[in-house]
Amino acid sequence: MKRKQFVPALAAVMLLTGCMSGRTYEDLPAPAYEKSTLQPVGDYSTHHSYEGVPAVREETLASYRSKDGICRIDAKAHYYDVTLDMTGGDAYAVGAAYAEALKQLPVQFEQMTEDYLYDTMNTVYRSADSLAVIGSDPAHKTELIAGRVHTLKAALPARYRQEMDGFASQFSGGDTGFVQDGRLSQDEADLLHLIPDVLRETACSGITVNGSRTVSGKRLTARLMEWDLGRENAMTAGNCVVHFRNGDHSVTSVTSLGLLDIITGANDDGVFAAVLDVGSREELYDCTGKTSYTYAVREALETCTTARECGEYLTRRASGFPYNHNVFITDENSAFVAEDCHTEYDGVPLLRDESTPLLDTLEWDAPDCLCVVNAFAAKGQGDQMTGTKHNILRWEKYRRLFSGTEKLSLERFKTLMTAEKAGTEFTEIRGNGLVFLLIADYDTHTLQAAFTGREGVADMPDFLDLGVFY
């Protein structure tokens, strides 16, 4: 088209489109969009305070006892309080008494537990890595799990094996294997006590503040336990505290109904210990010739009187555990992370404290505080912090919360631990899988817990007074 023909044509187009009509953008109707879901970062902070909010001591609503009196279960509003008299019979009798009392509960323990075990197995072995190792054949999956259970149980001290056998005797009727039929077989009951060693799905964290940073002058320790809560948060129906009463070797475990190993516990000398999964960058899971580290934690708490002794006990045995993990350990005067590394690819077993040099990629400026996540942190260890979102972001969130020199009261400590709104895309510390937030207060010698209920993780949960632990 020649120029003299193009100009009039362009003018005509502009006239038709309104470009020369004198209308402005104000004359145009605004397009309709859905309301934005973006929120300012400040909306992800809770802005609450626990000042003047005491822990709640729940009353017993009902009690259930074994016929021999070895086990008593007190049902509270939000958890079960279990007492096992370890002097009331042999180990087999203790396990059997616990199971006998559990069968009396209105929560249908056997069905609830089996459902949870199979949900967890399906979740863990649904990943691409697991499928590459075991394939998609259900029979192969249960065969693998049974092999792990048998191997780890066989390596336990006799008294723990006898407890497990006594426990299973009340459910199995002699049945073995894995069949989802509403009844716990021997193998299914044994798996219950070995879940972390066999299935390994955790994302936990913790921090401790020594007396120089607290108003009371005594240590405060917090441990967050996270797990797959199951369908409709079914696992929360089994929130539980177990008191293993055995004179000077007594231990308290904060756990789920039925478990006899220890994932989080404290003894009557004030030693607190909690297991956190780590894993390996190079090595696949192999329990051949290995033993359970959650039962090793129980044994350490039953025999050790200081945090250092407990940590050294565990690091000496690290090569005998099936996979890498941390154990967060405190007493009134000291705090450690036992970095239980069992393979040369990922480092060495060691005790980390506040003065231990850290990985070059880590920053920490919270004096007199020791933090732990699902990775080793000591200099020279394999780096599973960098590039692992839930580890590095949690570490950084703790650093920011506890940096500076503010002296913390128990109430302020609780406020900091719940400073994030729960369950958002920006939540780093209290994820949707939080089972409980547990605090050991070395001023009052008490444990306080905020248990997650069926409704999920609360922004400002009630802390329950679980009583004196030493």
Model-derived features: positions:
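Basic side chains
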Residues: K2-K4, R223, R298, R394, ...
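Gram-positive cell-envelope targeting signals
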Residues: M1-T24
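Residue-level detector of functional hotspots within protein domains
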Residues: Q5, H150, T252, L257, ...
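A periodicity- and composition-biased signal for non-globular, repetitive helical segments
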Residues: A9-A11, L229, R400
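Flexible loop/turn segments at secondary-structure boundaries
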Residues: L16, V215-S216, D228-G230, S280-E283, ...
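Internal mixed beta-strand/loop scaffold within catalytic domains of large alpha/beta enzymes
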Residues: E188-A296, L438
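C-terminus-biased signal that marks the final domain/tail of proteins
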Residues: C19-C204, L301-Y470
